[in-house]
Amino acid sequence: MDVELEEEEERICLRTAEEGQLANMDDDKLVSDEVHLRQLSATPSSAFSLQHSRGSDTKEEAPPEGGTMGGKSAAPREEGEPDERVVLRRAVDKGAIALAQIDDLKLEGDDDDEAVVNGEEVDGLGLSNPAAQTTDDEQITVNGTGAAATSSVAADAASSEQDAASTAMATPDMSKIPRLPGDGAQMEDNGSGDLPPSLRASTTSILSNLRKKQQGGPLRGGVAKQTPLRVQSVRIVEAKRAYGPKRRTESCSIFGNSNFEHDLESGNSLASIPGQSQRPLNNEMYSAFKSGNVVKGILCPSLTNSFKQSSLERSYLTYTHRQRQKSLIIVNVVDFVLKIVLAFVWIMRRSELGPIESDDGTSMATAITWSVCCGIANMAICFLGYWRCFANNYLHWAAVCTWVLFNIQGFVGQGVGFADREYLVWYILFVIFVPYAMLPLPLKWCVVGGTITASCHLAVITIIKLQHGEATINPECVLFQIFANFILYTAINVAGMYTKYLTDRGQRLAFIETHKAMEHKKESEKELQRTQKLLDSILPNIVNNQIRSEMYKGTDPTVETQFNKLYVYPMDNVSILFADIKGFTELASKTSAQQLVKILNDLFARFDRIAEDNHCLRVKLLGDCYYCVSQFESDNWKTRPDHAVCSVETGLHMIKAIKDVRLHTHVDLNMRIGIHSGSVMCGVLGNKKWHFDVWSNDVIIANHMESGGIPGRVHISEATLKCLNDAYEVEPGNGGCRDNHLKMLNVKTYLIKRTEPLRPKRRFGTRSSAHLAGSVATAAPPCATPTALPKSISASGSGSIGGVTATGNDGASIDGRSLEYAATIAVPAQQPTQLLQQQQKKNISLNSLPNVVEGVAMDSRRIRNGCGVMGGAGGTGGGGTGPCGMSTVSSPTAMMSAPLEVQLRPRNGACSIQNLAEAIDGKGLIIEDESTTDWIPEIPFKNLNSPEDGLNRADSILVDTKEDHRVSVAVLDEEIDEFIEQNIQINSNKEIRREYLNPWTLKFKDKSQEQKFCQLREDMFRSNMLCVFVIWIFMVLCQVIIIPRCTRLIICLSVGTVILTFCCVLVMAEEFPGLPRCLKTNSAKLVHQRQRRTLFICGVIVSMCMLSAIGLVLCPSSTYIGTADEHSRFLRMVSPYSNISMTEKEFKLNVYLSATIHHNITISTPASGGPTPLVDITSSGPSDEFVRSTLNALTLNLTPPLPQSHRPYTLTTNGHSVSLSNLSYSDASVMQSSSDVEGQCAHPEYLVFTWVLCLVSLATALKLYYLVKALMALAMVAFYTTLIMMKFGSGDSFSLVELSRLGMPLGVQMLILLISFLVMVCYHARLVEVTSRLDFIWKEQAERELTNMKSNRALNDTLIKNILPDHVATYYLSDEHTDELYSKMHNLCGVMFASIPNFQDFYSEDIDNGKACIRILNEIICDFDELLEEPRFASVEKIKTVGATYMAAAGLNHEHLRLRGETSEDSVCDLVEFAFAMKQKLEEINGDAFNNFQLRVGICSGPLVSGVIGARKPVYDIWGNTVNVASRMDSTGENWRVQVPENTAELLCSRGYTCVKRGEIAVKGKGMMTTFYVHPKGISESQLISPVRMPAGIPLAQTPNLQRQTSHHGSFSAVVFGMLQASKRSTAIAGTPTGTPSPQIRRGHRGSTFSSVRLSQKSTTVNPVRRNTTRVRGRSYRQKKSSSNNSIVTQASSSYMPSFRRIDQIETTISKSHNDAL
């Protein structure tokens, strides 16, 4: 289990099981809802959503399977709980409860025995949960943790532990599975946080019932419940079927649980309650990290603060580094300004104290040079950081350079104005803090850098102290100073590390949302691409684009209108080709189902390639019939001028391809090809199973051209012959002798003499780019001697090329039509584009050729040996990669009569023809015709999940799908990382900030978004306060060490420590159940309420600020600096030997005891060589001589940072000034002044260092609003500045002067330090604020992208289910069989062909090119499609429509029949009932529109084969003798009758149907067959009415109109419309609420294009509006509720009258044209 849990933590799937659970039928709806309910109930968050109220007369039952949800045992309530909410809160952490335990909960107010839940009656099924009564996931509120509040106290401890142990292994802990935003686990997007009434419960009543349950007493109303039978059946079925297709699980990432819950008492979403937001921190939220646990709400820091997934870690580092681009620049700017300020102070001090001696020029030049170089380095790093390219890839190295530069400055200290190394403690604090707060470096790097800086500086100070003997004279003071430095460095490191850790951890959690947003966006785009691929595979691009453009700017097609939208478009001057396989029935009888589908897929895939290469477009597959139409340009709907040639070439290639199949299968197969040219209407009809189709009289003629054709020959009409322009030799076809329709229309037909294609297909290879790159990677051999082409190559494909004979595949000539090439091929390698230029000069148009490759592939990198060759053989027109490596293409000209010569002229190093022939092989870029190459047929839907265009041949051939599946996970991760690289750019962050945030306040411009952000729960608040408390402890230690023996200070610090300890306890009180209730209540308020939290943090920081500075006021000056009394004592030691009256103002030593620059001088004598008290050497001489002798003997033994000496010093005494010239001073040693003799340390600057820690503690409050932080920091620095000016600048307190002219006053130095940290803290606050708000935006986008992804996935599923039956769609969506052909053998199925035979008589192209008539057909087919939505026809599947023929089948899904308890015979009966319903529906249409359409139905039952064929245009089809017989039953049937063969009639008679024998009839291909007419059940032969009086099969009494029902899959137009809305959402502005616009009710006026009136001489004045009443009855609910509905209908009716009068006026003419046609 541990291994499984670890693996689960590594990758947590994005897609949950709830996403695809929608039942197909109404009977399955409860099953789906129950399973969805059970899955949601598997998390403790759904406890309150699953409270069932039961009656008192039921019995208790055992918990269902998997009753203990989450696998955790329930625990009894502990004693002494002071608050009921505490019990619930504690239950959250204890585990989940069983469903049965939830069922036993009796809600408050359930005193009676009625099954009522908060006023709502339980339905008859016993399901009171609204989640079981709806399929809307958004209505099912999932409570993250609050719902689990009752789990730990629900049952006895022992029993629950046993239950948990028994189910833990079988039932996974669903509570640990993260809930994605928007899938029902979060209510943030719902707009209202209120739960449904039946989901609300009283906490008091729940707890009281739980206590009763725990104590063993029965609950009120007592008794347990009996599960309803239907629910039991649901649970039985649940284990037997899979609900919804399996989805891909590769797009997985590592996400923590969702952070949304609901209030336990009110049931409201915490996101909607002010001050309440996400759930508290727990370890589950950090399962994606390598380490770092949460203990009592405190994040335990860890140096390995990284993701477990390396790719995710790399993406995050890139993400966070780019966010700190500006901070890197700010740090270097601050350091640069700091150098300028130090230099300015140094210049000011020099101007005050006088010029420096000339011998210091070299040292000063070094200092200036050092400062200038460091400043240049700062500016260089700034420019690199500003450079976008560098910042996007190498920003962290610029940060490392910054850190190195700062350390060099701190340890060398050679800059102008810099003090000695041991006095640069303030700068080292700055250097340690900067990487944590500002630099874009990982946490581990920051810790290592801070530790190195601190350790090195401590070592430097210690070494310097030891070298100069200061540790010997006063070891205690040196030790205190070193220890104080250690505390300061440790405090800065700890504060910086923990702040960086908390900031980084918060950013990582937000980055997960960011990564999720990007992943969802990528998935959404993939889903949309897959949907578009599927749509492109169904419809041609031109029709697809036209439909999309109309839908994109149109209204929602799902809104009911009076007429269905018609997507039909006219096309003129096209050629239609029909091809039928002769001998297919024999082939089907000799092969298995899998073999037959494989053969058909191979054959039709070849036909698709042939059609595409010859610029033809496949229309549809009709069993073994294939028909296509010549293509047209997608931009202007213009057809090709050579459309007839393209169609003939397609037919000839098909005949050639069938020969190969005949050789392999040993079956007499052949092709009958019929071609006719004319105009068509192209588009789609109906609402279900859209298929591209064409309609016109010319299409019918083309169909009969195929029927009247000859196998193995291309049969063309006279219209086609006129379009060929004598390109082919023909002979009379006499098609009228073989087809009556052609004879009736007097169509002259011809046969193409050629049996081989005029243009043998020669095309590019289909290898992938990787394979091609590998094949060309090898260098070509050296070019041989030049060889010319001595003679031309004929169009037959044979010819001699330099002694090498090149023979085409067909070997036949082109009947005198020579295609001889005269193009010069030898081209210099330096100018490969001349190849194309030469062809253009000779008027060779690559785009105008029917079977030529699309372009010329040239790559200069592949040119070898400075030569390039382009060769073409005869009419084969192809391309190849010569030995020189240049990829070339040639093709035959479209102008047949233009002779071209091909010559290879020698040139410098030109390749030989032999090398050219070697280059053009099976591995090259040229592939011969199908018969000479091994071609792998494409698999349908193989490219469904491919990341690139599925129509690209390189994607569908020579691709190892298994290998692709193995690397799919890694590829997906790389794609997401690359996607993040492209989207999370520096400029992207800047654009988002400008778009969403106010540039000054950083608040969201959208107030609702700002309010939502302010309601976020601050889970790091406790960790922040703990860090503040630790910093305070360090501050106390530092002040106690530096300021000893100050009782008042110690008391104040102790009181402050107690106060801060109480504050920490208050913050942590919510995690400790034993604390008083008031503490826990206030603790919860601090976490949830932003305003309280802000005031609390401000109070704590202000307290720390005041307490840290109070020592400067309360403590005597003697505790931290030498005072006047100390100087007087020192002078009184000298007074016995001098008559000078010494006072503190008379003796002013020009020695400034600054802790960081020049103070604490050691006095040594040359004789002793060691430190000697000054009193021992001042016992002789008068005052002037005493001063001179004393100070001349004074030597300073330490090395200065700047090698300067002989600095003038002045000693003033009794009005006399003595110049001291030969003096040196120490660089950084902290030594004793006159007070050091008594062992006292003077380090006032360490007080300021503790003040810096206060500023750092302010930075640790991460979620404090940045303006509040900035104002507090400014106030603190102003307060500290006042203290510095008052104390450090007072002459009374500090009667000291500067030691040297280069020295800096302590007050100025401390001000620089405070200002530097002020800038860092303020910018860090702004950085954290910007980052948190950007992360919040990304999180919102993640939720929107998830919604879009789910919508796109639903569209994709619906789309594929409109292409395929549900069970076949499930097969392909499972992603387990995408490399296999789908085929299945069915023993018994029903097949129906229902046609409207008189529609052809009705059809006329006189009005709008026949579009008006097609509109009527569309209405009829849409009504037929609506019948399929009825539950009684669940087993009936629409296959396709062909013209006015509707094809359907029943019994194809055996599993569905088994679940419904039906047999295959029942499905055949359902199909018959469907035929009767179609007849009734057509009668209604006739009655409404005053038409007389008639229906003719043929049904046959028996075995058949189903499968999916066609890789580029996959279609589901059925084959077999049953299908053929059903088609013949239709074509030989009678109007208004259902004709069946004998075996089907026997089956139907056994099921109660009346079958009347028709007799034996002649059936094409079957001979004589006995057929029957089927009548509805319950009608005997004696009751049948004569067919003369009423058509057979029409019910005597009309049943009520069938209302239009909502489709479970949705109409196809609704799918496309939804896809377009998804694309709109994907291009919408991020951050704004996205969603499908509310559809507008389209009340279109039926004007001149209205075609729903029978075009006959019958008057239309009675009811001019066709089907007005039925359409009004079928309106949507919104239209029914419209108050102006009646007026709209009346107005519409009156407005349509003129149009119908116009139609009436041309009725006579149309009727005459119809009669003439007959």
Swiss-Prot record:
Cystines in this chain: none
Comp. bias intervals (Basic and acidic residues): 75-84
UniProt keyword annotations, A-Z: ATP-binding, cAMP biosynthesis, Cell membrane, Lyase, Magnesium, Membrane, Metal-binding, Nucleotide-binding, Transmembrane, Transmembrane helix
Protein's recorded name: Adenylyl cyclase 78C
Cofactor detail note: Binds 2 magnesium ions per subunit. Is also active with manganese (in vitro).
Species annotation: Drosophila melanogaster (Fruit fly)
Observed effect of gene inactivation: RNAi-mediated knockdown in sugar gustatory neurons results in reduced sucrose response and no alteration in response to water. RNAi-mediated knockdown in the pacemaker dorsal lateral neurons (LNDs) results in reduced Pigment-dispersing factor (Pdf) response in the circadian brain neurons evening cells (E-cells). Isoform B: Results in reduced sucrose and trehalose substances response and no alteration of water response or bitter perception.
Keyword presence, Transmembrane helix: yes
Segments of skewed composition (Basic residues): 1668-1681
Compositional bias annotation for Polar residues: 41-53, 1648-1659, 1682-1693
Binding sites annotated in the UniProt record for Mg(2+) 2: D580, I581, D624
Domain of life from the UniProt record: Eukaryota
Residues that bind Mg(2+) 1: D580, D624
Binding site for ATP: 580-585, 622-624, 672, 1440, 1517-1519, 1524-1528, 1564
